[in-house]
Swiss-Prot record:
Lacks deubiquitinase activity. This is Inactive ubiquitin thioesterase OTULINL. It comes from Homo sapiens (Human). The lineage of its organism: Eukaryota, Metazoa, Chordata, Craniata, Vertebrata. It holds the Pfam family Peptidase_C101. Residues 128-356 form the OTU domain. It is a peripheral membrane protein. CDD domains: OTU_OTULL (cd22798). Keywords: Cytoplasm, Endoplasmic reticulum, Membrane, Nucleus.
């Protein structure tokens, strides 16, 4: 009996143990699978993070490389432009109203006034284009000399009668103007024993250039030569200093005439009535020496320039629009046969060249 029950119990224990063993196997398999998936996930996550980090680093690197390359490219472009492109001090013609629209945007009273002034030039005075002139303390002299050369205007009558190369020595030796050695060459601020020699060379250069331009009849060829000349800053500077000396010579000549009680133009009476320009020396020290350095030409200097070169300088003063001073001439009473050149200014300090 006991033997009969014993195998039965054994079979019952086997039947009850079989599910337990199967459950353990399933649990072990699931645990192993979970661990494997976790390991794979961690590896995948690490790989993704590594890839993202690499991608971010690559983006940052290429961004810096792009910025650096762009900076170097701009530098080289600027260098090549400076190296091979003419740095014109008188730019090419641009449409007048387009220039006005670009420079005088906005609705301030001054902007509105300037736009009306430019429209007046366009419609009433038939000025269609403008040449921008480099803004510095020589720009009035530059604007005048450019037009004299580009138009092929001849020497003033008094220059045809005298050798202007000898004017410095005439002042120094014939008229005893020893103070000429205090002449200052604009920003160079050079004074000393070599002033006489420098002035002579500069005046001779002016005579040579003027003669060459005056001898060319082809307008386009003169324009091409002007582009070459007015891209040479050193050469320009010498010509402007020569013009300043021509002005000083004329002031000295008229002053000598005044001392002998001769009739002189009214503009010179005004010049000599000022404490700061009562004679040629004070005019040079207080006014002319600063031109090209700390200031440009004043209105009375424009009168002297026009008188010295025997040209009628018509200036449209745009900031004086709707007043009697909108259009002025230097000098006010030029001779009929004097050639005319035109300038425009927005502030009486800087000048541009109108093109009709």
């Amino acid at each position: 009996m006991a033997a009969t029950r014993s195998p039965t119990r054994a079979r019952e224990r086997e039947r009850s143990g079989a599910p337990a063993a199967g459950s353990d196997q399933v649990h072990s398999w699931m645990l192993a699978t979970s661990q494997a998936l976790d390991t794979v996930w961690r590896m995948a996550k690490g790989f993704v993070m590594l890839a993202v980090s690499f991608l971010v680093a690559a983006i940052c690197y290429f961004r810096r490389l792009h910025l650096y390359s762009g900076h170097k490219l701009k530098w080289w472009i600027g260098y090549l432009q400076r190296k091979f492109k003419r740095n014109l001090s008188v730019e090419a013609e641009v449409d007048l109203l387009s220039y006005c629209a670009r420079e005088w945007k906005g609705e301030t009273p001054r902007n509105k006034l300037m736009r009306k002034a430019y429209e007046e030039l366009f419609w009433r005075h038939h000025i269609k284009c403008v040449r921008q002139v480099r803004r510095d303390n020589y720009d009035a002299l530059r604007s005048v000399l450019f037009q004299i050369f580009s138009q092929g205007i001849s020497f003033p009558s008094w220059m045809k009668e005298k050798d202007i190369v000898k004017l410095p020595e005439k002042l120094l030796f014939s008229q005893g103007c020893n103070w000429i050695q205090q002449y200052s060459f604009g920003p160079e601020k050079y004074t000393g024993s070599n002033v006489f020699g420098k002035l002579r060379k500069y005046v001779e250069l002016l005579k040579t250039q003027w003669t060459e331009f005056n001898g060319i009849r082809d307008y386009h060829k003169r324009g091409s030569m002007c582009n070459t000349l007015f891209s040479d800053a050193i050469l320009e500077y010498k010509l402007y200093e020569a013009l300043k000396f021509i002005m000083l010579y004329q002031v000295t000549e008229v002053y000598e005439q005044m001392k002998t009680k001769k009739v002189i133009p009214s503009l010179f009476r005004l010049l000599f009535s000022r404490e700061t320009s009562s004679d040629p020396l004070s005019f040079m020290m207080n006014h002319l020496n600063s031109v090209g350095d700390t200031c440009g030409l004043e209105q009375i200097d424009m009168f002297i320039l026009g008188y010295s070169l025997e040209v009628k300088i018509k200036v449209f003063r745009l900031f004086k629009f709707n007043s009697r001073d909108f259009e002025v001439c230097y000098p006010e009473e030029p001779l009929r046969d004097w050639p005319e050149i035109s300038l425009l200014t927005e502030n009486d300090r800087h000048y541009h060249i109108p093109v009709f």
